[in-house]
C-alpha cells in the first residue's frame, strides 16, 4: 500500500474497556458521549487537496459510537489505521464485512496478555485476529514487553504462532524500578527484540530546535475536535468543526520529547540521522550496528557529547570500562550541567556491578546543555 505522507492522529477517546497495569490513561469504561462528525473531518482533509492517513486511536476506538460508519466515511478518500485491543467482537466482525482492506493501512493490535487473560478473552482474540487476516487486512499484533513480562514473552509468542498469529514485541515506554525504558533494557533487549530491530524506533527522541513539518504534514485531533500541531506539541491550530490554520514550512520543534511519528517529519543532518540510527540499534542491543552508526555520526559531528555518551554506553556493554569512563568524561566536560552525563560518569567510577548507563536521546545535542 502507498501510505500517504500526511498523517492525522485522531485521539478519539481516552476511555477503554481494558485495565492494563502499565497504561498511562486512567481506566474508564463508561460510554463514550463526546463524538465528532466524521463528515466534517473528511471535509477538512479533502480541503487540503492531499491524501491523508488517519490513525484512529485512544483509548479503544471500537467502543466509539458509529465507529464503522466513521471508517466508511474516512476511507472514501483517505486511508485509515486503527490502534485497538480487538476485544469488541461484534464491531470487529462488522468492520471485516464492511470496510475495504485496501483502504486500511493496518490494524495495530495490542495483545495485553495479562489483561486478556483476566477477562478470559484469549480465544476470542484469536478468532478476531484470524478473521481479519483471512479477509486480507494487515494485522500487526504487538506485545508490550513490560520488564515483568520479559521471561514469558517467548512462551506467548510461540503459543500464538501455533494459531497463525505473529507477535511483534513492543518496547515498554516509561519508568520501572527507577529506570527509563526502553533504553534500560540494555543487553537483555537482544533476547526479545533481536529479530525486530525496527522496534528501536519506539524511542521518544529530543528534537527540540530542529526544523519539522508537524502542523502541516502531521496533526493530532482531540476528542472535542481541537487540532494540535502534533502529539507532543499542544499548540492549537483550530477546531476541525470550525477552522484550522495549518503551518507553513518547517518551524522548529519546541519539545524535548517526541512521543510519536516525529522521525517522519523532522529534518535531520546526516550526522543527526546516524545518531538516531545508533540509538535505535542500541535500544534493541544490536550493539555492533549501533557502534558503526555512532562512529559515523561522530565523524560528521566531532565532539558531539550525546554521541560520545552513547559510544560510552556501548563500550561499557563490551566490558571496556576505561574507554567508557573516558567517553563519559568527555561528554560531561563539554556539557558540565547535563544530569545524564553526570549520572553515567558517577556510575562508571563507582564500578557498581549493577550499573547500567543511560542512552542520550538529544538529537540536537549541541543546542541543549541539559
Model region roles, listed by residue range:
Residues 2-38, 231:
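Canonical Radical SAM [4Fe-4S] cluster-binding loop centered on the CxxxCxxC motif
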Residues 27-36, 50-64, 75-91, 101-125, ...:
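Core AdoMet radical
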Residues 54, 118-205:
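Conserved C-terminal portion of the radical SAM core fold
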Residues 177-277:
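Accessory C-terminal segments flanking Radical SAM cores
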Amino acid at each position: 500500500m502507498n501510505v500517504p505522507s500526511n498523517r492525522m492522529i485522531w485521539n478519539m477517546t481516552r476511555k477503554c474497556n481494558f485495565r492494563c497495569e502499565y497504561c498511562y490513561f486512567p481506566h474508564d469504561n463508561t460510554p463514550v458521549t463526546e463524538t465528532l462528525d466524521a463528515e466534517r473531518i473528511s471535509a477538512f482533509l479533502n480541503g487540503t487537496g492531499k491524501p491523508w492517513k488517519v490513525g484512529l486511536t485512544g483509548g479503544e476506538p471500537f467502543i466509539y459510537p458509529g465507529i464503522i460508519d466513521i471508517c466508511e466515511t474516512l476511507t472514501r478518500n483517505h486511508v485509515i489505521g486503527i490502534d485497538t485491543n480487538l476485544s469488541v467482537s461484534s464491531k470487529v466482525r462488522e468492520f471485516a464485512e464492511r470496510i475495504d482492506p485496501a483502504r486500511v493501512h493496518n490494524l495495530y493490535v495490542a495483545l495485553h496478555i495479562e489483561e486478556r487473560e483476566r477477562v478470559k478473552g484469549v480465544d476470542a482474540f484469536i478468532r478476531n485476529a484470524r478473521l481479519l487476516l483471512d479477509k486480507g487486512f494487515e494485522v500487526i499484533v504487538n506485545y508490550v514487553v513490560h520488564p515483568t513480562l520479559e521471561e514469558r514473552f517467548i512462551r506467548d509468542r510461540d503459543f500464538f504462532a501455533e494459531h497463525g498469529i505473529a507477535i511483534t514485541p513492543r518496547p515498554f515506554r516509561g519508568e520501572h524500578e527507577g529506570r527509563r525504558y526502553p533504553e534500560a533494557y540494555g543487553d537483555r533487549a537482544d533476547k526479545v527484540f533481536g529479530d525486530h530491530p525496527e522496534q528501536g524506533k519506539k524511542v521518544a527522541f529530543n528534537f527540540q530546535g530542529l526544523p519539522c513539518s508537524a502542523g502541516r504534514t502531521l496533526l493530532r485531533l482531540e476528542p472535542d475536535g481541537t487540532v494540535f500541531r502534533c502529539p507532543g506539541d499542544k499548540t492549537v491550530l483550530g477546531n476541525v468543526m470550525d477552522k484550522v490554520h495549518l503551518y507553513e514550512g518547517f518551524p522548529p520543534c519546541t519539545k524535548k520529547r517526541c512521543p510519536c511519528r516525529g522521525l517522519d517529519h523532522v529534518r535531520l543532518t546526516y550526522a543527526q540521522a546516524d545518531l538516531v540510527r545508533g540509538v535505535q540499534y542500541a535500544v534493541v542491543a544490536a550493539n555492533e550496528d549501533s557502534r558503526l552508526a555512532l562512529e559515523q555520526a561522530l565523524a560528521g559531528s566531532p565532539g558531539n557529547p550525546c554521541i560520545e555518551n552513547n559510544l560510552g554506553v556501548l563500550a561499557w556493554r563490551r566490558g571496556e570500562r576505561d574507554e567508557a569512563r573516558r567517553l563519559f568524561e568527555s561528554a560531561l566536560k563539554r556539557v558540565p550541567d547535563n544530569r545524564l552525563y553526570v549520572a553515567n560518569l558517577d556510575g562508571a567510577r563507582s564500578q557498581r556491578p549493577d550499573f547500567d548507563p543511560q542512552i542520550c536521546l538529544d538529537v540536537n545535542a549541541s543546542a541543549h546543555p541539559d
